[in-house]
Amino acid sequence: TYTDRYIQEKIESGSSFADAWENIFGSLEYTAVMDQEPGREITIDWEHGGSDVMMARDVYRLIFEGREPWILSANGTIFKYDTKGIVPGLLERWYSERKELQAKKKDAQTAEDKAFWDKRQLVKKINLNSLYGAILNPGCRFFDKRIGQSTTLTGRVIARHMDAHVN
């Protein structure tokens, strides 16, 4: 990808991995699609194994003006949003369970009970925060680099967007 090559060139010129990403809040492919850059070719690798090369503006139209239930993450991965995946379903359940544990902590009468429920909700918080990191581990049954990258970069884009509107 353009992004992989760009980051690799920065690292080879002496930048650290973190410095190579300085001021880049989404993949170069994502930015090209969202800006509908003319002349920028994007390769789409489909789930069935085939590939298509399209102009960034055409990818934008395909995703946002087409009839498919698709959304584009900040790393350029196209996801379907008409069905809930295993990982989002699991996160939704854990989040709901954490909210219940936080409510029990709030309702607790003694310091010991508050500490107990606080530790229980903290375990859920750690589970929630760790899942996408685990998905980036090649030893994980659900290993998929795209999902971990999508979460990280999309979170960055959202934070940047919110910062621009708040500040």
Q: What kind of feature is each model-predicted range?
A:
Residues T1-N167:
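Conserved acidic
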